[in-house]
Amino acid sequence: MSTIVITTHGTLGDNLPYIALGKALKTRGHEIRMVVNEAVYSYVLKAGLEAFTSAHSRIGPEEVRGNAQLWNQLPLLKAKSKDKTKSVIKKDDIIDGATPLLKVCHGADMLISDSEQDIFAAVIVDVYDISWVRSRVTPFSQGFSDTKIEYHPYYKSWLNTENSKRFILAASPHFCPLSPEYSHVHQTGFWFYEDSDWSGGEPSEEIREFVEQEPKPLVLSYSSQPLENPQEIVEVHVRAADKLGRRILIHQGWADFNQSHLPSDIDRDNVMFANGFIAHDWLFSRAAAVINHGGIGTIARSLRNGCPVLVEPFAFDQFFNALQVQKLKVGTAMDTEKLTADRVANFLDKKVLTPDYKKRAVEVGEKINAEQGLIAACDLIESWLSS
């Protein structure tokens, strides 16, 4: 048995694939220690893994909702005069970030880091005789070569993967193949998280009856994306669903979508709000389309179930993921600054809810389902442990 430390950063959606990896490695007899932000502690413990606090501030629903404007990068991307200010990482920042890892990695055999933690993981590798595996759960950066991105010089050495033979990309090549310069990266397929509460397979009777009616409902799921204007987003989508004669299930998520956001003139029998976790495989396999923010986990799960998507991106890798959806013709994407009920309804009608888009989503989903991302990752990791 080996002791493996996994360190991650980000919101819940960023952490769940790593929790899934930790569970898979534990079933193979390894001791797993996870260094995460405090907001995802409960998910780590629920998976039967050891949880340790990272140096990062808590990133939970309340924290991100309080700074929702920081999670909307579209205005900055559209600005004619880009902000050229570059962040500077100080020595103290690196020490602070690496200190929790130093304690947890003592006596461990391997450290697995997501890309946000690489700069701290590199410090650990210099201190301990420990195997290091780098990783990403989104193909952004490794999936293209024709887009120019400026990084602070300090980051460039950590972004470079050419000298890293132990780098795993937990995304499907059927969603985004690697560009040639990243051919050395091991692409395993997606790491799907399965919650123990999903083992029953079906949600409450109320949700089941709502979802299983015809025509199939739309699903609005922004997952851990916070919003400055959740009421406006809800109103646009319930009105769009009404125009299409569709019911809509809205997942509360970190935007805190709720009944108070509904306009008074909407038939509430055609709208349902869902709190907490729902078995996504059950839900998405019964949905007409999943409207989402472009998170890689939500898109992957939708396609796994042959469900086309409408992507409404706000920040980070979401724009790249939206582009891939359009390239694959498994759905489309919209400018989130131009969301209206008429436009959303039209995009859904013409570029999501058609037989061709459904057929393509099913085809891609079958390829994704044929992959065994977690098994492939565990096999790689164990081969590196023994080498």
Predicted regions located by residue number:
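Nucleotide-sugar-dependent glycosyltransferase catalytic domains
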Residues: E38-R246, S260, K359, E363
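Short glycine-enriched loops at secondary-structure junctions
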Residues: T138, W254-A255, A315-D317
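Short internal beta-strands
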Residues: I32-N37, I248-G253
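Nucleotide-activated sugar donor-binding and catalytic core shared by glycosyltransferases
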Residues: T3-R33, A39, Y43-E50, S157, ...
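Short, catalytically relevant binding-site loops at active-site mouths
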Residues: Q225-L227, A255-F257, T298
